[in-house]
């Protein structure tokens, strides 16, 4: 590190501007301190004089409404101050949602359900985080529903999840992932099984909307829904399905006028559709980087991070004790289906999986369902494990698991196409 980097640099920001920086180098570390004034990161206020640490992959935008001075130490690949920021439009969206919440509170009704939609790499997850943080800062307790199975913000990829937000996200680590409601999908894109994806989204919406009635504060606070970046063809159909399932009253469209106009045409006139600009700090991610991000999330699930390391367990399970299934059977023409069944019914069929070496590195979901006769699709999951070895001679698989052996009684495991190479040492 150069002398200049070790001493650090002060950045003076005017009102309604933001400091943006990116860290791409492995093992790089950047420390940020708010010297004076007021600043926030994606809606979370920075504490004065406290050091915040960011590592590889961080894409940071620290915004100030009133002006501030930030002290930054470490090597950044990109760093600049921008006065062109959509934060004022974003806070206006929060203000509009607050009006809905206040009215819902007064009339004991359900609060607003707002969906954030747009193509990949326009800042959907970031806008969700901003809206959620602003909500809890004024005393709300909203639910956060993440339908993005490609880059999950709550659970690992291949699942849809919902979590109750009770406090602002940590500047460095985001929202706590405690007690999420997670439903298994098993693919990195809705295109992996469109029928199953719609079924899982419908179930999540049903359960989430019912849960709002359990707490008056959460009921009036409503739900923020994050979505996938697939917005054309079947992807657009999935967005419409989610809007209907959740009864969305507002849809925030990021950076795509075509999608905005299609939604204006296709959703009820009672739904507020708002076109918003993306932040200039949003960075397009390559296919390789997306894969790395998925891998990192799975690694953190099993091993934690430097601030809070986890120590997972490895143990063997005999083939005969392994109750492993997959949702979705190979497609058959309608003429080959039993009377009364259609080909798409196969998409939600639960079929047994025989262990083979092809299972190595696959992530498995542990379902709360006790039998395939239960509603497996409509049953949430308890956690995940990963197959690290398959011994055909001894008829055993080796599992990486957050919990020690044995698996719970009647454990029902669900296959996913997600894979994780456990190279942790």
From Swiss-Prot:
A GO BP entry: tRNA splicing, via endonucleolytic cleavage and ligation
Coiled-coil regions listed: none
Q: Identify the species of origin.
A: Drosophila persimilis (Fruit fly)
This one is known as Protein CLP1 homolog
Q: Does the keyword Nucleus apply?
A: yes
Leader sequence range is none
Gene designation per UniProt: cbc
Q: Which domain of life is it from?
A: Eukaryota
Question: Where does this one sit in the cell?
Answer: Nucleus
